[in-house]
Swiss-Prot record:
Family: Belongs to the metallo-dependent hydrolases superfamily. DHOase family. Class I DHOase subfamily.
GO cellular component terms listed in the entry, alphabetical order: cytoplasm
Keyword Zinc (UniProt): yes
Organism: Elusimicrobium minutum (strain Pei191)
Protein name, as recorded: Dihydroorotase
Reactions this protein catalyses: (S)-dihydroorotate + H2O = N-carbamoyl-L-aspartate + H(+)
Cofactors required: Zn(2+)
Hydrolase among keywords: yes
Major enzyme class: hydrolase
Protein keywords: Hydrolase, Metal-binding, Pyrimidine biosynthesis, Zinc
Amino acid sequence: MKYLIKNAHVIDPANKIDGLKDILIENGKIAAVENKIEDNAAKIIDAKGLTAMPGFVDMHTHLREPGQEGKETIFTGTKAALKGGFTTVCMMPNTNPAMDSKNNLAIAQDIIRKTANVNVEIMGAITKNRAGKELSNFAELKQAGAIALSDDGSGVEDDAVMQAAFKESVKQDILLISHSEDSKLSAGGVMNEGLISTKLGLKPISNASEYEMVKREIQLAKGLDAKIHIAHVSTKESCEIIAKAKKQGVMVTAEATPHHFTLTDKACESFSGNTKMNPPLRSEADVEALKQALKDGTIDAIATDHAPHAVHEKEVEFDLAYFGIIGLETAFPLAYDVLVKSGLIDMAKLVGLMSLNPSKILGLKKGTLTPGADADITIVDLNKQWVYSKEEVQSLSCNSPFIGKNLQGYIEYTFVGGELKLENGTLKVKDA
């Protein structure tokens, strides 16, 4: 179907567009972006007062299927993506079975073909069964369609194994994504180390458990002239290490999550399992460092680390609750509030962080409204305030500390490959 989006404020950093434009969609592609377009054969979307941008790309999504369908499925997770304005998500490999072989990728790819509501890319596992001991077959995974490789959920802690992974990643030209955590330093911890963990009597996780591993990854990447992407950066020290490495020419990129630059460890005073995540919520100083790193380019992308868990896994004692929260549906309004409304960055910068930059890092032909590109478009009402209620949640799980919160910035329309899949905030998808 042909669509004509009229009167939108279009923001497309790739083409330096930031103003009122019309967008014509034809045959699943962007046909034109011009000051005024007329086409009587197209369905008109009047976007007056709304902001249109390339669809968001999430580098870090846990869709849980195959193997953990009680938490999330590819169908429900990609419904949440649509609701949050994400048109492409990258599913992490900590499924059951892990994404460590072409056969296991094929299982996920079959489900994606049948049930996904957005574009889904797959992260292969760096090591077999994500056990951190023996490398997966990188060439096989790349040929099978893996977009990058990670053992996310845990890090590859053996130095020799990670060094071998870097060497093979250079050989196969595939990006490694690091869950930077030294479990010897974080062992048994449940929240950030500091006054609040002491006051609450909860076992701490030090900043060093993250930044020491970030330091190692960068040293290995530098020595082997390899690329590395650091997932879910949460500490001031990590930001400083990454900034220094970039100045030295190391091919390092990094992401931060909205919860890590929105909340501090003070949120854990509620003892709610929905404030427990890995990396943990950090101090005010860490949050400020993340925001500055997003502003100055030290951190390249915003990712959700959407991590659904069932009620019985979260509504328990804090020590026993699983790590992780959902994030696809709240990422944009949180980032808009903390980064744009505060005056720290402008909308063009935010679109870069959520769409163009993740696309570039992963080598995807996304994140742009260039004519000929896939018509993946998100249209937002920046002024609309709404409550993130349990009834609103499209994910199979509701583990979010933002449930019940007033948010600003509402996704009105989401196009995926030229198909209108969210209209006036309502999903237009059939049940799987």
